[in-house]
């Protein structure tokens, strides 16, 4: 493994700027079996190397893929350490749960040393936290929200401050910070174009994890509930069956849309073929400003079925905060000032 300066910067960003770990603490790194294709061992090795160099007692525990009882098996082990870093999807399964774990958890969406050494992993964590807060503030001030996309999505509703409360957010530290707090969908209506794939949210495990859509389909939504689907009959039936199966499997509300949010980190990238693993694609690229995603199927965040909307626009009282998949930070004082403050944000948004 080449321990480059950029990699060292990314490792320090994770350990100190995000996890805020100190040398008198203990660290466990949960590494998902690299053979599963989601995480590479080199990222765990790099973090362990830095931690041990400063005197942090560090353990790497390799685990399998996520299961629906993953939390129960690991809770006791994790609580024996001051800090846990997840290079594993199981760290994302209970990201909205704050009740079971007593110690600090970090869920990493950086999946390899190369990923960590890129702008995705090196952008100062605090800058992204402040940028997220700026966007939350903008939404809290907003009145009418309109969401569109080039394929024909038209989805709108009114929001108020109660929709931006932090208790809707996750109970685990995320690295890097990729999305603002989810916006409740219960006041939104319209049509959303479903294209390419329906994918899981990373919450529970089920098969098939994703379904391919041979034709685009319209989801008609009324006040946060899916009324019906319109389009090619076979594709619509496939979608309906998927929702039926997942909702029965977990005994959840089939056609509920819990919330939505869009990516805020332009350094997010995905270089593999989408068709090889749509689940991995959607659960990696969601942090890009080019994508907005919906949490559907279930009356909780993040739901179980994800809708990915590409090159969306989001208008707040007719002013675009996102336009065709580009985050228009200059249009709002809060985001403009945040980018002006942080060189790291200027490097990903401007340079």
Where are these regions (language model features)?
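Active-site bordering "gate/hinge" segments
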Residues: 1-216, 222, 319-324, 328-351
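Active-site proximal loops enriched in glycine and acidic residues that flank catalytic Cys/His/Asp
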Residues: 31, 194-196, 221-223, 230-233, ...
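Short solvent-exposed loop/turn micro-motifs enriched in small/polar/acidic residues
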Residues: 139-140, 210-213, 253, 287, ...
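A broad, low-specificity signal marking well-ordered, structured residues that form hydrophobic/aromatic
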Residues: 145, 190-192, 258-260, 292-294, ...
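Short conserved micro-motifs at the rims of enzyme active sites and ligand-binding pockets
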Residues: 204-205, 231-232, 271-274, 305-307, ...
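Dual-mode signal for accessory low-complexity, basic/Gly-rich regions
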Residues: 212, 228-230, 234-295, 346-349
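Active-site and channel-lining beta-strand-loop segments
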Residues: 215-230, 314
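Internal helix-turn-beta structural module
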Residues: 279-347
